[in-house]
Amino acid sequence: MEKTNVLIVDDSSINRELLQYILQDRYQVYQAENGAQAVEMIQSRERIYRLMLLDIQMPVMDGFDVLECLGKKKLLKDLPVIVISGDASNTAVLHAYELGAVDYFSKPFSPEIVLNRVQNILSLYKHEYQDALTGGYNRCGFIRKTENILHNAASAKDY
C-alpha cells in the first residue's frame, strides 16, 4: 500500500528530523526548511501532500504567510495544516485557525500526541478523496490526481 505524503515545514533541522522519525514508519515524509520552499513544493504538484506540519516562526516566509498564501490560491481545501509552534499565545493560535489551520499545538511535543493528531486529521480528510467501499479514488480524488498528472505533463521538458 502506498504511504500518505506528509510535508514537514520547520527551519530547525532538529525538529524536522524528530518529526520525520515519529512519522516515517507510517507516512512518506518530505521536508521544507522554510515557508517559501514549502509553497514551491506544493505549487509544483510534483506530489500530492495529504497533510502539512507547519512551524510559525521561520525566516524567508513564516507560517502565517504560508497559510495566507495557500489560502488565497485555494490550496488549503485539499491540504489540512497542523501548526506546531513554540508560540502558544491565544493570539497566535486564533490567527492560525483564522488563516485555515485545522489544528495547533505547541513545542515541546509528545511523539504520541503528534502521531495521534496526524492520524485523526488524515482520517477526517480521507473521505474527501477516497471511496469508503472500494478504497480507490472517488470523484474528487480522481480529479485531483488527473490535474496533477496533467500539470506535470505540461511542465515536463522531455516529451
What annotation goes with each model-predicted range?
Residues 4, 12-31:
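Two-component/phosphorelay signaling modules centered on CheY-like receiver
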Residues 46-53:
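Active-site beta3 strand of CheY-like receiver
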Residues 58-61:
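Receiver (REC) domain active-site loop signature in two-component systems and cognate sites
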Residues 126-147:
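Conserved nucleotide-binding and Mg2+-coordinating catalytic segments in signaling enzymes
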Residues 143-159:
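Active-site-proximal structural segments of metal-dependent nucleotidyl cyclase/transferase enzymes
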